[in-house]
């Protein structure tokens, strides 16, 4: 395999860059390098980083980058790294792979690393950072010192990754601590980029105050999943109040009405609300269909009376004031 020396900028810099005009990345026979790889892995496990670097320096550029990639892939990321291993991996992340191959992308030939060990090193560093955040958050949560505002603020470039670490930390806590954190979060006016945190806590605790916070958020699939948990944690008047409150959000109104009508027995508050919604020009037909499925004679009688009035007198805003729901049914 003969490398091609690029004169510029390679010779000017004194470090030639290698490339090959082949459609597939070059293949180094793994069997030939297996002994070296096992030796390198053993040295790495024992913290002998100088020995690792010395052996790699004796290899050809292609073999060195291949071995580096395999070595980094074999590192265990299920536990935090030692400071020395972290520093060694960070040093690899700062290097630029120089054994390149040409590949056709969208009709153009582009040069790409054959063995991108630097990208693998950056991946390891990111995974270790996640573990470190997770451990810190768990300790703070257990001690009652965690502050949601330390993560949730506008402009935080690490918000998505830190939220993922927080959710992993919460997964390891008992329900009693989750209930405490749910009440703390409900009392705070902080920025939330989505409803993942609210949905997770509600699916574990059913904290009523947290539902109220959720109804004020933009609706997404996590909000719908959290709405569905109400009937699992609450019954009777409490469930009725939560679902009626949810129905004030136009994007939650239809699923909230469906859940409300499914309460059994149906609380008086829910009956009155649903009968009142018959006058809603947007949702009246849906509510009528839902009420006809309810096995309660008194409610069915009231429904028949309302529908009879509707047949005799066309529904108008004067007879049946609109509940204030928008004219168009929004999509979920």
Give the positions of each predicted feature.
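Amphipathic alpha-helical scaffolding segments comprising HEAT/armadillo-like alpha-solenoid repeats
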Residues: 164, 176-184, 195-196, 206-214, ...
């Amino acid at each position: 395999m003969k490398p091609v020396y690029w004169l510029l900028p390679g010779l000017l810099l004194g470090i030639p860059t290698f490339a090959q005009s082949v459609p597939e990345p070059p293949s180094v026979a793994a069997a030939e390098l297996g002994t070296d790889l096992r030796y390198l892995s053993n040295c790495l496990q024992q913290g002998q980083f100088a020995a690792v670097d010395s052996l790699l320096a004796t290899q050809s550029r292609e073999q060195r980058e291949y071995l580096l990639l395999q070595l980094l892939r074999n590192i265990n990321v299920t536990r935090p790294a030692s400071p020395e291993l972290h520093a060694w991996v960070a040093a690899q992340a700062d290097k630029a792979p120089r054994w390149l191959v040409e590949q056709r992308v969208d009709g153009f030939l582009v040069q790409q690393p054959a063995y991108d060990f630097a990208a693998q090193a950056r991946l390891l560093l990111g995974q270790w950072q996640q573990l470190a955040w997770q451990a810190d958050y768990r300790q703070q949560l257990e001690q009652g010192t965690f502050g949601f505002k330390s993560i949730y603020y506008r402009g935080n470039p690490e918000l998505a990754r830190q939220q993922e670490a927080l959710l992993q930390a919460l997964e390891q806590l008992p329900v009693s601590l989750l209930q405490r954190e749910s009440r703390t979060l409900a009392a705070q006016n902080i920025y939330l980029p989505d409803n993942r945190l609210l949905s997770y806590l509600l699916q574990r605790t059913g904290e009523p105050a947290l539902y109220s916070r959720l109804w004020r958020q933009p609706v997404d699939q996590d909000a719908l999943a959290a709405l569905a948990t109400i009937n699992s944690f609450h019954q009777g008047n409490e469930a009725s109040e939560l679902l009626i409150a949810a129905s004030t959000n136009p994007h939650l109104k239809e699923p909230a009405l469906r859940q409300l009508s499914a309460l059994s027995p149906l609380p008086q508050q829910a009956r009155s609300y649903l009968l009142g919604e018959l006058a809603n020009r947007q949702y009246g037909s849906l509510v009528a269909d839902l009420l006809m499925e309810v096995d309660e004679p008194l409610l069915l009688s009231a429904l028949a009376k309302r529908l009879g009035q509707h047949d005799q007198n066309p529904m108008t805003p004067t007879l049946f004031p609109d509940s204030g729901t928008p004219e168009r049914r929004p999509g979920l």
